[in-house]
């Protein structure tokens, strides 16, 4: 749609019964959208001058006068046009400042000459030289002026909100009128077609009548011919008088024939007259019908023209509504900028006051005045920064401001400045508190504190607990306050934990498990633990004696021989006991995670701790299946389509991360640490990998699997699982003990090529066999209705595919992932996921405990500086590399930092790689022990690193509203996702359900508070207008499969449906309707399915009341389902006449459901096609 010009200023709209004033940016007003209201007031007309079109195409500057008025009660039709005023070339240009308190007369009476230049920057303002010099001399606004700016921006936001709501309502009304006109046009054309059908029938009857007339004429001619023949025959008989008797008989016969011919002639004449009369009537009727057709044609054409004009009006008002919402978003940004500027000024002022108080006891009065000058300069700097961030609205040079600026210019601050600053600080506190209270009133149940949501997040994978929708948060507490509060609540457990920790340190220092310690390399690590423990304090020495006392107590018990079976059982009991004790304990610690509990339990009962577990090797072999079941579960929650949409990050970001990180670490290891080339290659590739099990578990616990950084992290981890195969193949080839004599390019190429072929054959076979066999096999087993056999078949599929990939040289986890990916496409995925949940949880916990068993705390104490330095370099270096690589792939800085923190720790495959390197003679056992320790500690730090990433995001990402705007690069990997328009209570529940099933979605809302809450929970929620084509394009609407629309107002819902159906018709839209009439209009606008919001809440309340009335649960469910089915059937029947499908957008094979039996629900008696949107 072309616009004549974008006027870069604000205009005043004045209308309504109460003459309320509305501020609107003049870029919303174009020569094509020109206002002409009632009573001579001009409003928009869809026609536009061709000269103005060419002007906008050539991007020429057009000047307009500044006065426009809008009647708030216009009836939805636009007429007339706004002619551009004669351009006035004036050397000056400035921004016209429009406040909600201004009037139209003020704007009209403004006799200044304005010139507005159209350009890329909407906020570019030019001043004359005098004004520019004056502005440079003026100092920044004071705190009071900043508060005034904030108040003005808040008022402007309120006006913009009312304005956008008004335009959305008008857009809805105009659209409804357009729909009615369209229906009238369609009805008129139907009447025309029906009349034409009647005319055609009349024409057919006319042709039949003409044929009858022709037949009657022919019959009359035949009768006359017979009469003539009879007369001639009679005359001929009269001349022949041979026999009188014969003549008499012949004459008699001839007379009879003559009479018969006369009768036929008479009958034919009557028939002919009747046919001619009928033909005349049909011709008259045809003429009348033709006139009726002409009249209906004219009426239909008029209705069609009116409908087309109405559609143009709808397009125009939709553009105006979109621009009104855009202005509201800009006003929100200005309010946010004003708040930030005010907070900066207050922070600077409070800091300066504290500094003055501290220095006041030493400095004299002169120094105090100098300190005040420094404070003033800081405030001026902050004010200049705020001025650059703000679009200054209504800054007028009043007397107070001028006096303040003159004081600053002369460098003579008053002696009472400190007192005034203190008063201003107190006022600013009250303003901020009042502002926070207003925001909390706007969102009473939705904007609960971030701290509360984060605490509940640790308890469950559901990121929206029930308290989120009912609690009123008192504000976001700091991290320190949350730690103190948690410590007060959990102080007995903390004391117990520190006691156990001290006992463990004492045990390690006392040399428990000395026989299991690996030999140390003198030139790399320090083998003496005495240097560490010689300086211990008396309390620690007393704690070191605890293990000996515990051993003495144990020796007092009678000793019995333990056979192999009992030893295995005891190992299982110790593992379960340790997990039961440590996991709940670490979950209570702030920032704790079950992973940390498992790791701590493994350290304590492992070979480097109390040495309780005897068969460590067998335990590790079993624990590997924990990772197998985890990857199988991840595959169940994904799909082939979603995986294909992530190929950019899997093969792009993943390969870049592995190659770059391995190269950097390998070079540092070779040139800085002096390791050999093969060892540097193994160390670089081993440390480049991350822990799939730990990271995915942490993401699921925190509910971040579907977030931006969660998707990117999973993609990199998936590629790392493939890269492990290459590393394990490479280690024997570069070994000095290899039969081929070390590194050989040909040998490596041959091995990798053979491995690639085997992997491709194995993966292809698994995918092909799974698609052909899994569904029939599971159907056959499900028909037996045996849960044990069903679970056994699931275990067979998991272990079988894992074995196949292991035999092909791939990891077992990759095979399980493929099996889960194939089962996700069947209808048995939910049952399969439920069956494997117990195995997955226990085996995954066992895996984390085996990782803890690999950590040697005594070796850590002996080589603490070396290990901590290596650990710090690993975490910081990998994070920096991932941030750089992620930025190149379009990931934002904050998301890239969070991905880097999650991928920075080492992985479980490093244990395998380093162990194999020791066996091949590439690295020494001492070095591998140190690397085991570094990798194990880094894995233990993963939950805290994830929490640190969230803290960074909450501190930096949510400061500015602009950071909440959608960016196309952040959603370009989404395919077939869901768009949630409106992140209120309904949108949040939908987001929770989708996130729990790992279904990708993107949410939009115009409330920055709601968006900030969603972003703090790592959800893909963006600040934007759901009815804007540009915003919808940025969130990938052209690739989305459906949209759930639950905005606050009916007008906003209607505008969003209209935009999606017009610009993105492939997206199925499911909308919340306020009532049936609203739902019908939404369906006419293009909604796929409409859900009346009154039905389901009524049914829920009715169910609660019936339960209170002591009705059985089964009877309540039957009654509710019966009513729902009957209501939807009646609603569908009522909508059949209008051609809509209101009633959740699905059809039934039966018009009315059968009454359900006691043993059956109503859902068993009807076949439903489609998805029930409730």
Curated annotation (Swiss-Prot):
Highest taxon in the source lineage = Eukaryota
- Resulting phenotype, residue 721 to A: Loss of activity
Q: Name one GO biological process term.
A: reactive nitrogen species metabolic process
Annotated RCK N-terminal domain ranges read 975-1092
The UniProt pH dependence field says: Optimum pH is 5.8.
| Coiled-coil stretches noted in the UniProt entry, renumbered to this chain | 142-350
For this chain, the Swiss-Prot or TrEMBL PTM comment says: Acetylated at Lys-170 by the stromal acetyltransferase enzyme NSI.
MF term (GO), any: proton transmembrane transporter activity
Q: Which residues lie on this side of the membrane: Chloroplast intermembrane?
A: 587-592, 642-648, 700-713, 768-807, 863-865, 920-928
Which sequence ranges are marked TM in the entry? 566-586, 593-613, 621-641, 649-669, 679-699, 714-734, 747-767, 808-828, 842-862, 866-886, 899-919, 929-949
Extent of the signal sequence:
none
Biased-composition ranges, Basic and acidic residues, are 420-448
Q: How's its activity regulated?
A: Repressed by sodium ions Na(+).
Q: In the UniProt record for this chain, what is stated about the effect of gene disruption?
A: No visible phenotype. Disrupted K(+)/H(+) efflux antiporter in the kea1 kea2 double mutant. Double mutants kea1 kea2 display strong growth retardation along with pale green leaves associated with a delayed formation of chloroplast pigments and electron transport complexes, as well as maturation defects of the plastid ribosomal RNAs and hampered RNA-protein interactions. The double mutant kea1 kea2 exhibits a drastic photosystem II (PSII) quantum yield recovery under moderate salt stress. Impaired rapid hyperosmotic-induced Ca(2+) responses in kea1 kea2.
User: Which body tissues produce this protein?
Assistant: Detected in leaves, stems and flowers. Expressed in shoots and roots. Mainly localized to leaf veins, hypocotyls, mesophylls and guard cells. Accumulates at high levels in small and dividing plastids (at protein level).
Recite the UniProt keywords alphabetically. Answer: Abscisic acid signaling pathway, Acetylation, Antiport, Chloroplast, Coiled coil, Ion transport, Membrane, Plastid, Plastid inner membrane, Potassium, Potassium transport, Transit peptide, Transmembrane, Transmembrane helix, Transport
Q: Which GO terms describe its cellular component?
A: chloroplast inner membrane
Name the NCBIfam families for this protein.
2a37
UniProt lists the family membership as follows: Belongs to the monovalent cation:proton antiporter 2 (CPA2) transporter (TC 2.A.37) family. KEA (TC 2.A.37.1) subfamily.
Q: Which PANTHER family does its entry note?
A: K(+) EFFLUX ANTIPORTER 1, CHLOROPLASTIC-RELATED (PTHR46157:SF2), K(+) EFFLUX ANTIPORTER 3, CHLOROPLASTIC (PTHR46157)
Spell out the protein name for this chain: K(+) efflux antiporter 2, chloroplastic
Q: Which gene encodes it?
A: KEA2
């Amino acid at each position: 749609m072309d616009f004549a010009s974008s006027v870069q200023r604000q205009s005043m709209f004045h209308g309504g019964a109460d003459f309320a004033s509305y501020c609107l940016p003049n870029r919303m007003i174009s020569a094509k959208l020109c206002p002409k209201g009632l009573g001579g007031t001009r409003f928009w007309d869809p026609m536009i001058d061709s000269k103005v079109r060419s002007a906008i195409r050539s991007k020429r500057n057009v000047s307009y006068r500044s006065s426009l008025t809008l009647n708030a009660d216009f009836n939805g039709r636009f007429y007339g046009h706004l002619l551009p005023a004669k351009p006035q070339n004036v050397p000056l240009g400035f921004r016209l400042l429009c406040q909600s308190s201004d009037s139209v007369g003020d704007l009209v009476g403004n006799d200044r000459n304005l010139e507005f230049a159209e350009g890329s920057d909407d906020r570019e303002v030019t001043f004359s030289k005098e004004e520019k010099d004056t502005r440079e001399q003026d100092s920044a606004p004071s705190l009071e002026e900043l508060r005034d700016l904030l108040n003005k921006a808040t008022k402007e936001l309120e006006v913009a909100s009312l304005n956008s709501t008004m335009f959305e309502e008008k857009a809805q009304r105009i659209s409804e009128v357009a729909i009615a006109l369209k229906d009238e046009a369609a009805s008129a054309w139907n009447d025309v077609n029906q009349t034409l059908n009647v005319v055609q029938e009349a024409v057919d009857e006319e042709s039949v009548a003409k044929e009858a007339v022709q037949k009657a004429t022919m019959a009359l001619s035949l009768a006359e011919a017979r009469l003539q023949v009879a007369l001639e025959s009679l005359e001929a008989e009269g001349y022949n008088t041979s026999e009188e008797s014969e003549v008499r008989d012949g004459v008699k016969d001839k007379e009879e024939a003559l009479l018969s011919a006369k009768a036929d002639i008479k009958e034919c004449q009557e028939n002919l007259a009747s046919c001619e009369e009928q033909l005349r009537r049909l011709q008259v009727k045809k003429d009348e019908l033709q006139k009726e057709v002409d009249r209906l044609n004219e009426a239909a054409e008029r209705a069609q023209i009116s409908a087309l004009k109405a559609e143009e009006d709808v397009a125009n008002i939709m553009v105006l509504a979109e621009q009104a919402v855009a202005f509201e978003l800009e006003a929100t940004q200005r309010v946010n900028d004003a708040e930030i500027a005010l907070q900066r000024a207050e922070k600077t002022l409070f800091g300066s006051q504290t500094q003055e108080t501290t220095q006041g006891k030493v400095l004299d009065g002169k120094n105090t005045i100098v300190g005040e000058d420094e404070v003033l300069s800081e405030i001026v700097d902050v004010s200049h920064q705020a001025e650059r961030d703000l679009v200054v609205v209504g800054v007028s040079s009043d007397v107070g401001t001028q006096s303040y600026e003159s004081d600053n210019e002369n460098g003579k601050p008053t002696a009472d400045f400190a007192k005034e600053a203190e008063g201003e600080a107190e006022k600013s506190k009250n303003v901020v508190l009042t502002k926070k209270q207003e925001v909390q009133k706007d969102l009473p149940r939705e904007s609960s504190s971030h701290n509360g949501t984060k605490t509940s997040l640790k308890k469950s994978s559901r990121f929206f607990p029930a308290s989120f929708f009912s609690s009123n948060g008192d504000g976001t507490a700091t991290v320190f306050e949350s730690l103190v509060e948690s410590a007060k609540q959990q102080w007995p457990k903390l004391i117990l934990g520190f006691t156990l920790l001290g006992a463990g340190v004492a045990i390690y220092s006392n040399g428990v498990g000395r026989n299991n310690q690996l030999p140390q390399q003198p030139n790399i690590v320090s083998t003496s633990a005495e240097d560490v423990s010689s300086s211990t304090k008396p309390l620690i020495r007393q704690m070191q004696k605890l293990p000996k006392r515990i051993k003495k107590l144990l020796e007092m018990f009678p000793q019995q021989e333990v056979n192999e079976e009992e030893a295995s059982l005891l190992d299982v009991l110790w593992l379960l006991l340790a997990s039961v004790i440590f996991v709940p304990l670490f979950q209570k610690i702030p920032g704790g995670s079950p992973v940390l509990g498992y790791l701590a339990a493994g350290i304590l009962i492992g070979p480097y701790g109390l040495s309780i577990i005897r068969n460590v090797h067998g335990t590790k072999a079993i624990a590997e299946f924990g990772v197998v079941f985890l990857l199988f579960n991840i595959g169940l929650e994904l799909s082939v389509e979603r995986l294909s949409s992530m190929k950019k990050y899997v093969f792009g970001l993943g390969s870049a991360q592995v190659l770059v990180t391995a190269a950097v670490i390998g070079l540092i290891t070779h040139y800085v640490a002096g390791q050999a080339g093969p060892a540097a290659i193994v160390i670089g590739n081993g440390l480049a990998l991350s822990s799939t099990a730990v990271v995915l578990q942490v993401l699921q616990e925190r509910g971040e699997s579907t977030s931006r950084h969660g998707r990117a992290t999973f993609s990199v981890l998936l590629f790392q699982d493939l890269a492990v195969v290459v590393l394990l193949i490479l280690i024997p080839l570069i070994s000095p003990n290899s039969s081929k004599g070390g590194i050989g390019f040909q040998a490596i190429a041959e091995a990798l090529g053979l491995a690639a072929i085997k992997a491709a054959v194995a993966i292809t076979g698994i995918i092909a066999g799974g698609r052909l066999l899994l569904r029939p096999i599971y159907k056959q087993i499900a028909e037996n209705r045996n849960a044990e056999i069903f679970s056994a078949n699931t275990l067979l599929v998991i272990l079988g595919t894992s074995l196949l990939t292991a035999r092909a040289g791939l990891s077992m986890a990759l095979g399980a992932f493929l099996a889960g990916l194939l089962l996700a496409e069947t209808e048995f995925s939910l049952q399969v996921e439920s069956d494997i949940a117990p195995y997955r949880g226990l085996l995954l916990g066992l895996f984390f405990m085996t990782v803890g068993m690999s950590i040697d705390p005594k070796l850590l104490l002996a080589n603490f500086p070396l290990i901590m330095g290596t650990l710090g370099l690993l975490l910081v270096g990998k994070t920096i590399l991932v941030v750089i690589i992620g930025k190149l792939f379009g990931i934002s800085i904050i998301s890239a930092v969070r991905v880097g923190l999650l991928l920075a720790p080492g992985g479980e495959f490093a244990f395998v790689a380093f162990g194999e390197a020791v066996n091949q003679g590439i690295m020494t056992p001492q070095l591998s022990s140190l690397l085991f320790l570094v990798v194990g500690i880094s894995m233990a730090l993963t939950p805290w690193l994830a929490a640190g990433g969230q803290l960074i995001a909450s501190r930096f990402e949510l400061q500015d509203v602009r950071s909440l705007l959608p960016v196309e690069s952040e959603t370009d990997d989404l395919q077939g996702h869901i768009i949630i328009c409106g992140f209120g209570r309904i949108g949040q529940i939908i987001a929770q359900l989708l996130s729990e099933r790992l279904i990708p979605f993107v949410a939009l809302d115009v409330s920055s508070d709601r968006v900030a809450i969603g972003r703090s929970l790592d959800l893909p929620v963006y600040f934007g207008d759901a009815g804007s084509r540009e915003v919808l394009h940025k969130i990938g609407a052209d690739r989305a499969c459906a949209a759930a629309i639950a905005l606050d107002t009916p007008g906003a819902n209607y505008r969003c449906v209209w935009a999606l159906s017009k610009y993105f018709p492939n997206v199925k839209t499911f909308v919340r309707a306020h009532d049936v009439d609203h739902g019908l209009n939404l369906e006419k606008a293009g909604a796929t399915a409409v859900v009346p919001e009154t039905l389901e809440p009524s049914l829920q309340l009715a169910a609660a009341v019936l339960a209170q009335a002591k009705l059985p649960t089964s009877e309540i469910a039957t009654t509710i389902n019966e009513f729902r089915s009957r209501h939807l059937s009646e609603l569908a029947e009522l909508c059949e006449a209008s051609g809509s499908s209101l009633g959740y957008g699905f059809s039934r094979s039966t018009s009315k459901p059968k009454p359900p039996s006691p043993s059956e629900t109503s859902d068993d008696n009807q076949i439903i096609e489609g998805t029930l949107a409730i």
